[in-house]
Swiss-Prot record:
Description of its domains: Has three domains with a flexible linker between the domains II and III and assumes an 'L' shape. Domain III is highly mobile and contacts RuvB.
Highest rank taxon of the organism: Bacteria
Any one GO MF annotation of this record: ATP binding
Protein name: Holliday junction branch migration complex subunit RuvA
GO terms classed as biological process: DNA recombination; DNA repair
Region (Domain III): 151-193
Organism: Cupriavidus pinatubonensis (strain JMP 134 / LMG 1197)
């Protein structure tokens, strides 16, 4: 398994890279989030990688953070989600945005990713439920998910509400609302339900 590549960035043409590592050029596909953070060609680059071995090819995927690579690994475990689709998901949203969409059961955010329809989004939410927040949201290098909606969700769960009830109530809370005000608004929404 090739877990990490360090070398000189020779070519970059989205989403493909060519990295020279002691005279050997590795073709690596990366999500756009990693691509945008790459140095200029001719500069040193280090990427965490995932090698996918298929019957007809050995494909190398690169990531700028452990959180991205871990998310990629979780995504490709899901039936019907291949490496290309996983790369599209990571290109369309950050790890923290994906974790939040899964936690809040927001299929609409997932369907904005090209190639993800309603059924695939629902499968992603079902399969990744409970995995992204615990595993990937706290992984080294992961962007912290400190959005007030997540804090409100955790508070409602601690009060004994189901994830579905809490997620529905949070949708009634305007974006940018503080945690304490958001909890009050969510509780009001739950009392009316």
């Amino acid at each position: 398994m090739i877990g990490r590549i360090a070398g000189t960035l020779i070519e970059k043409n989205p989403p493909h890279l060519l990295v020279d590592c002691h005279g050997v050029g590795y073709e690596i596909d990366v999500p756009m989030s990693t691509f945008y953070n790459l140095p200029a060609t001719g500069q040193p680059v280090t990427l965490l990688t995932q090698l996918i071995v298929r019957e007809d090819a050995h494909l190398l995927y690169g990531f700028g953070s452990a959180a991205e690579r871990n998310t990629f690994r979780e995504l490709i475990k899901i039936t019907g989600i291949g490496a290309r689709m996983a790369l599209a998901v990571l290109s369309g949203m950050s790890v923290s945005e994906l974790a939040q969409a899964i936690t809040l059961q927001e299929a609409g955010r997932l369907t904005r990713v090209p190639g993800i329809g309603k059924k695939t989004a629902e499968r992603l939410m079902l399969e990744l439920k409970g995995k992204l927040g615990a595993e990937l949201g706290h992984a080294p290098g992961a962007a912290p998910v400190h959005d007030s909606a997540v804090d409100i969700l955790n508070a409602l769960l601690a009060l004994g509400y189901s994830e579905k009830e809490a997620a529905t109530a949070i949708k009634q809370v305007p974006a940018g609302t503080g945690v304490s005000d958001g909890i009050k608004l969510a509780l009001k929404a739950l009392s009316k339900a």
